[in-house]
Amino acid sequence: MYDYAFVHLKFTIPLAVLLTAIAYPVLNRIHVIQTGCLIFIAFTAALPWDAYLIEQKVWSYPPEAIVGPRLLGIPFEELFFFVIQTYITALVYILFNKPVLHALHLNNQRNPPAWMRIAKVTGQLILVALSVWGWKAAQVNQKTTYLGLILVWACPFLLAIWTLAGRFILSLPWFVTVLPVVLPTFYLWAVDELALHRGTWSIGSGTKLEYCLFGKLDIEEATFFLVTNMLIVSGMAVFDQYLAVIYAFPTLFPKVNRYPTPLMLVQSRLVNTTKYDLERIEGLREAVERLRLKSRSFYLANSLFSGRLRIDLILLYSFCRLADDLVDDAKSRLEVLSWTAKLNHFLDQHYGDSDATEDPKQKAERIDAYIKEAFPPFAYQALHLLPTHILPPKPLYELIKGFEMDSQFTFHGSSDSTNLKFPIAHDKDLKTYAIRVAGTVGELCIALIIHHCLPDMSDSQKRRLESAACRMGIALQYVNIARDILVDAQIGRVYLPTSWLKEEGLTHKAVLDNPEGPEVIEKMRRRLLDNAFELYREARPEMQQIPSEARGPMIGAVENYMEIGRVLREKKVGQVFVRKEGRATVPKQRRLRTLLRALYEQ
């Protein structure tokens, strides 16, 4: 009795609830709109087709297997299947695609490799052939009727989608398109096999080939679930392609609302690919790789941000890391001062007093010329793509001052011990340094979040958030220093305040010679961590005021980094994993648990 309803209660609804619970922390309004639009399209496209199948006796349902209500002869349980299948497959697609930055896969839209052009044309020809064959096969009362009706209905839609987004789909990593098709398909095959075995629904004899994939699962039913899931996944990819165009190219779409409008999606489809700034895509690719190599915690957290905010945060990190590397890789203090002077002049080019009548294009060309003249080629993209039109100048200048403080340390390999200089003399110097190299980054991140998520935020709320972000940045830097005492000592640096060392009867040389030895160093590490967690507890409640789209990912990034401090405090075997260079980190599973806990708490 009511077997079809129980199929949903036992198999489709529980899976949908489970996937919703898993995906909930990363879902945003764009995902909801995207999935809702696809459900509407799938429902309206399948409705007349399904009604025709029932009218022609291809599908039938025993009266006792359904609740009763119908629309165009279609049981409500079947109508619900249109919705729930689309929802399930869309969620699987979203989960697999969340780490992917789709903008990186737009470069093949203009200059695709030969294999991609061949694959797209081949796919089009195959879909045309299947559509024609399906039309001929879909004659009433013959063994190919059902299979033909599936192909003549689905293949034209697939052909249209493949024509629109074939290159983009081929550009994506295979697992983000193939697995969202395969996994729901296998699950629904198993559900269908059980339903057919119980007689919940049946396929009319004489309209099918009488071949089964396994058990009672007819080849036609297997084909149906496969092609419908292909439609859903490729439909989601079309949305993502046009969203990627909107987010990736600010010259084409200077102002993007929190949620792009349908008109913007149409406009992104109509943009000629010759207008794509492929140099920007390449620069973004470099920035992502720099983030991946240099910060595993923030690389993981960044994938949870969305839209242009995610891109601008990556570009900000790339600039900060590049500037830091220029200082750290310098061979002399003079070279460090040269780099900091050039970085300051670069900022002056953007923020300094300039001729108000200067054409913006000429200004951009002037700045580009300076970058190419003053910096090595590998630095060009990180400097060129920095979103200075959004970022406030003061934190950027303060960041450079932080690098200048680094330049006061003895350089690795120097044999002149008489010139040792350690700029962190007192607590206030430690705080100043942390503000400059980390508090500023927190302020810059908040500036990007406010610009993209809530530009009309009140000034008082902005100031509170900026202050909290600065304090949290200081806390993270204290954790960083506590973690890297050994690593810093290996390059001649001691960030522990001189006053702390004197209290414990230590010298800088003692720390450099044996950074992990004396118990008093561990005592100072704990003191540093205590300061970090005190600042963390002060700033953490204020972070709840971050706009909802960015709150979870931002807090997740913070919690992931503070977890390093927690495991340093615990000192449990297996909890702190020390890499070869002496830097402690958190096991991957624990990082993931920390991130998920932070997201679900939001």
Swiss-Prot record:
Residues 248-602 are annotated as: Phytoene synthase. Keywords: Carotenoid biosynthesis, Isomerase, Membrane, Multifunctional enzyme, Transferase, Transmembrane, Transmembrane helix. It comes from the Eukaryota. Disulfide bonds: none annotated. Its EC number is 5.5.1.19, 2.5.1.32. It is a multi-pass membrane protein. GO terms for biological process: carotenoid biosynthetic process. Coiled coil: none annotated. Pathway: Carotenoid biosynthesis; beta-carotene biosynthesis; Carotenoid biosynthesis; phytoene biosynthesis; all-trans-phytoene from geranylgeranyl diphosphate: step 1/1. It catalyses: all-trans-lycopene = gamma-carotene; gamma-carotene = all-trans-beta-carotene; 2 (2E,6E,10E)-geranylgeranyl diphosphate = 15-cis-phytoene + 2 diphosphate. Its main location: membrane. It holds the Pfam family SQS_PSY. Bifunctional enzyme that catalyzes the reactions from geranylgeranyl diphosphate to phytoene (phytoene synthase) and lycopene to beta-carotene via the intermediate gamma-carotene (lycopene cyclase). This is Bifunctional lycopene cyclase/phytoene synthase. It comes from Sordaria macrospora (strain ATCC MYA-333 / DSM 997 / K(L3346) / K-hell).
